[in-house]
Amino acid sequence: MAPLRFSANVSWLFPELPGLPERLHAAGRAGFKAAEVAWPYTESPQALASAAQTAGLRLVLINTPRGDHEKGEMGLGAVPGRQAAFREGLEQAVLYAKALGCPRIHLMAGRVPQGADRAAVKGEMETVFVENLKHAAGVLAQENLVGLLEPINTRITDPQYFLDTPRQAAAILQKVGRPNLQLQMDIFHWQIMDGNLTGNIREFLPTVGHVQVAQVPDRGEPGSSGELDFTYLFQLLEDEGYQGFVGCEYRPRGDTVEGLSWLRSYWDRRGHPRTGQ
């Protein structure tokens, strides 16, 4: 089995540094060959592309814009009445992805509207999401890009988020039926919502285009204490033939580089793979 390929999520890692270009440089110095950025839109794509190139990094994932952050929006894909804004945000994300050479975009579903009952609006929100995803799949296909759906847990992180379980996301992907749309598996969220990680990984991995990791419940380094045995989980991903990237989307408990001892141990044991696509 090939060793896993890890990417530094510089929206989370290196918080001791002020900006995304500085964090990209730090990720390269720490040994990463790939990086991801949740929201790159505060920087010009040219500045980010230059920083990534200087750092020897391949950018592998960005998110669509949040929407109106002051109004509490966290993505727009499933939000009724915000279809035009979702499509505008998608266009912006595609421009960034092309400029950065980034092959994947997380298509954020968004939150259940404030004051609405989740059960009452679920059908309408799913209909909006499916329509938006069909549109997005066509736009992305023209640029040879992949769109990702990420369930975010509603127990701890975001109680209002619409898409919260892998089964819900997989069912929506099946309704959309586009090969360039895939699952984004954040093991932190999946553990909190469903547990049963071995079964869920084996069931859903064929449709997974990207993985992210953090310890549960504090969202710290995989090497920190918590519910998850990452030695086992990394081996499981290898055994199941996962060939995508594993994003380090966690909250460092202290100095980021010191906290990467778990990853250095993995590289010492399994080798440092080429990044590829």
From Swiss-Prot:
SUPFAM superfamilies: Xylose isomerase-like (SSF51658). The active site is at residues 150, 249. Its EC number is 5.3.1.22. The keyword Isomerase applies. GO terms for molecular function: hydroxypyruvate isomerase activity. InterPro entries: HyI-like, Sugar_Epim/Isomerase, Xyl_isomerase-like_sf, Xyl_isomerase-like_TIM-brl. Keywords: Isomerase. It catalyses: 3-hydroxypyruvate = 2-hydroxy-3-oxopropanoate. Disulfide bonds: none annotated. Gene3D superfamilies: Divalent-metal-dependent TIM barrel enzymes (3.20.20.150). It comes from the Eukaryota. Belongs to the hyi family. Catalyzes the reversible isomerization between hydroxypyruvate and 2-hydroxy-3-oxopropanoate (also termed tartronate semialdehyde). This is Putative hydroxypyruvate isomerase. It comes from Mus musculus (Mouse).
